[in-house]
Amino acid sequence: MKDFITEAWLRANHTLSEGAEIHLPADSRLTPSARELLESRHLRIKFIDEQGRLFVDDEQQQPQPVHGLTSSDEHPQACCELCRQPVAKKPDTLTHLSAEKMVAKSDPRLGFRAVLDSTIALAVWLQIELAEPWQPWLADIRSRLGNIMRADALGEPLGCQAIVGLSDEDLHRLSHQPLRYLDHDHLVPEASHGRDAALLNLLRTKVRETETVAAQVFITRSFEVLRPDILQALNRLSSTVYVMMILSVTKQPLTVKQIQQRLGETQ
């Protein structure tokens, strides 16, 4: 008999930030209230089995295998971007830019994907290295980075997504006025700040590097911005990690709820 996942279990085990993706055991099913909660938060639901295969429910709520990044169950024929011809056998010098298009591995867009991939890897490592208070933050950061990768791969707009309930505007305000909202002024990283701040600073600088590479790819020579959504998302992620660094060095770090209260009081 399949286990049912309840609304209470979801709230206890996931941040449920709007626009994120969650993976649930393949042998589980959602109670009506749990499904309603996920749909209200616009979450993508995937089920994962013991072999790591991912599934989504079809209209009859039957599991259908899908690609981990694109959520697609189709395998279209890929064509070379240069010659527009189908690629029957992929050479080592070409790779997928999308499911339908292959490009040379020297393509700057692949350079952006590679740096983004490294940033995701570092975020996952910090999920292992850092203590429980940072886990909701890091889970949402990892999710946001994955959604950036997905939006770029599919050529789709990047939707809004809060980090631990904090909006892009909230994070912008916090990172620009930390003394006002977080009880600690701006900081320049140093060893005395401790291990957490040092590890978070690695992630912050990696996100900034990803943002600058994205700018090289998505801002044309005539200053046309091709993906303002991706550039803003990376900028706000850098702000997010900076806020985490400041919280890590304060003597009595505020909770997310306390931060939200302060933000609300000054609106």
From Swiss-Prot:
Gene of this entry: eutT
Q: Which residues form a coiled coil?
A: none
Which Enzyme Commission number(s) are on file for it?
A: 2.5.1.154
Instruction: Recite the UniProt cofactor note for this protein.
Output: Binds 1 divalent metal cation ion per homodimer with both subunits providing Cys ligands; Fe(2+) gives most activity and is possibly the physiological cofactor.
Residues engaged in binding a divalent metal cation: C80, C83
UniProt keyword annotations, A-Z:
ATP-binding, Bacterial microcompartment, Metal-binding, Nucleotide-binding, Transferase
Q: Which GO terms describe its biological process?
A: cobalamin biosynthetic process; ethanolamine catabolic process
Name the UniProt record assigns to this protein: Corrinoid adenosyltransferase EutT
One GO CC annotation: bacterial microcompartment
Q: State the protein's purpose.
A: Converts cyanocobalamin (CN-B12) to adenosylcobalamin (AdoCbl), the inducer of the eut operon. Is not active on cobinamide nor other intermediates in the adenosylcobalamin synthetic pathway. Allows full induction of the eut operon.
Q: Which pathway, metabolic or otherwise, does it act in?
A: Amine and polyamine degradation; ethanolamine degradation
The protein's location, in the record's own words, is: Bacterial microcompartment
Q: How does it assemble?
A: Homodimer.
Tagged with keyword Repressor: no
GO molecular function terms attached to this record:
ATP binding; corrinoid adenosyltransferase activity; metal ion binding
Does the record's keyword annotation contain ATP-binding?
Answer: yes
Location, primary (coarse class): other
What is this enzyme's catalytic activity, as reactions? 2 cob(II)alamin + reduced [electron-transfer flavoprotein] + 2 ATP + 2 H2O = 2 adenosylcob(III)alamin + oxidized [electron-transfer flavoprotein] + 2 phosphate + 2 diphosphate + 3 H(+); 2 cob(II)inamide + reduced [electron-transfer flavoprotein] + 2 ATP + 2 H2O = 2 adenosylcob(III)inamide + oxidized [electron-transfer flavoprotein] + 2 phosphate + 2 diphosphate + 3 H(+)
What family is it from?
Answer: Belongs to the Cob(I)alamin adenosyltransferase family. EutT subfamily.
Its EC top class is: transferase
Among the Pfam families in the record, one is Cob_adeno_trans
Q: Which cofactor does it need?
A: a divalent metal cation
Q: Which domain of life is it from?
A: Bacteria
